[in-house]
Curated annotation (Swiss-Prot):
Compartment annotation: Cytoplasm
Role summary: Catalyzes the oxidation of L-aspartate to iminoaspartate, the first step in the de novo biosynthesis of NAD(+).
Catalysed reaction equations from the record: L-aspartate + O2 = iminosuccinate + H2O2
Chain's gene name: nadB
Cofactor details (free text): Binds 1 FAD per subunit.
Protein name: L-aspartate oxidase
Main EC class the enzyme belongs to: oxidoreductase
Amino acid sequence: MRCDGEVIIVGSGIAAMMSAYLLRKSFHVIMITKSDVFASNSFLAQGGIAAPIAEGDDWQAHTADTWKAGAAHGDETSIEMMTKHAVNMIELLDDLGVSFDREESGGYSLGLEGAHGTRRIVHVNGAETGKAVMRALWKAIKNEITLLDRTCVYRFIKNKDEIIGVETDQGSLFAPVTIVATGGCGQMYSVTSNGKEATGDGIALAYRSGAAISDVEFIQFHPTVYTGNEKEKGLLISEAVRGEGGQLITSAGERLQSLKSRDVVSREIFRQEREGHTVHLDLTGISDFERKFPALYKGFNKSDRRTLKPRVTPGAHFLNGGISVDAWGQTSLSRLYAVGEVACTGVHGANRLASNSLLEGLVFAHQAATHIQQTFQPLTAGLFVERDKAEPRSFKLPTREDLQKKMMRYVGIERHARSLWYMNNWFQPFLDTAHYNGPWPERDMFEQANMTLLASLITRSAAIRTESRGGHFRADYPNGLDKFQQLIIEWQNGAHMKRQRPTIKELSR
């Protein structure tokens, strides 16, 4: 059978690039990205990478903080694996030339962020970590892989229960292994820190092909998104800023708790706004803010540069769930792996701990690459490729703006049975188009279908989970319930199931 490469990677964020870096010597790797190679949330990432690298810190403490932030919903085995590998990942990036900030003594300059028990965040130029890491990884792989940029994957090519390639707007490509690393879905909300490419493509592609997805009701809203500059709309003000002394203050002069977990701080700001107050981040207590956080300072408007008290609001930031995978990044479909934000590894539980996202991408790329190297099997001749389902008679989808506004209002920081029921009904006329498995007449329609499909599943999951936990808050069920602890809501082939994640032990400091 025709084979265009050995490993296809869909996406170009940190998980995609680390996968390519680890596989490039053993296989012909083809990386496909729908935009520029640096157009990813990884490139936008500010705060840094969490690693228990300081004297007195250890992986057990990092594990406990991760578990607690995740509202006791995380996969304990995966969390431990991630935290145990964290220091090795930092050392690897060091070897690749990433210039992490250091103290005069030569040790790492470690930041403190919300819900961490100690300083353990390595960073570059205060809040430019993503750019530095991505540039170093790209430099290491660019001459050893095939890049297809500005190429959109519209469909996974399926043979029975395995994925054997991808269909793009430039044609079909076949390979024995496909890794999906397309990131999250923040663009389905009207306020988000995510780049315009974050439209949930990978999850929708996998789901339409029959892969299981889980925990999608757990959306993390970052409490400090800056919208005061049209050119920098959705600029994230890193948690590192609050770790260095930035204080959240309301227009009424009330000081909020700045270093609680993200879900707690976001809900508090949301409630203040509902009561008619604005919330500002007072940066005047940080000496030499412009030097420590130059990119953030540059992103402020003139007034906020002068006062150093920018207004902030919560925005969609991270999807804690995604494509269901095991500890090796394997999905429920053979030959298909998922790594990074697109995957549900269980390490974040119901609410991600700050600066664990880049770490997850690095560690699980390593896991997937290791498994691929150990189990690689070439494609065999005579495979049967499933034909496309019939194209819908007409393509009917909501506008992006309408979807964003409704998701923010009804399936956002606070949810209620009434709002979820309303949204579930609102989605019904669009679902035939949203479930269609390509080919698509244009990219904008494809992205809108992906967001609509995923938004509908998020809404239905949020309705099923009649409790509050982490990034999922039900105003009509404001407390967590024991019967929902470690209960996973999983979707596959149009139906949902509830499964219990095995609990090994309760993690605590």
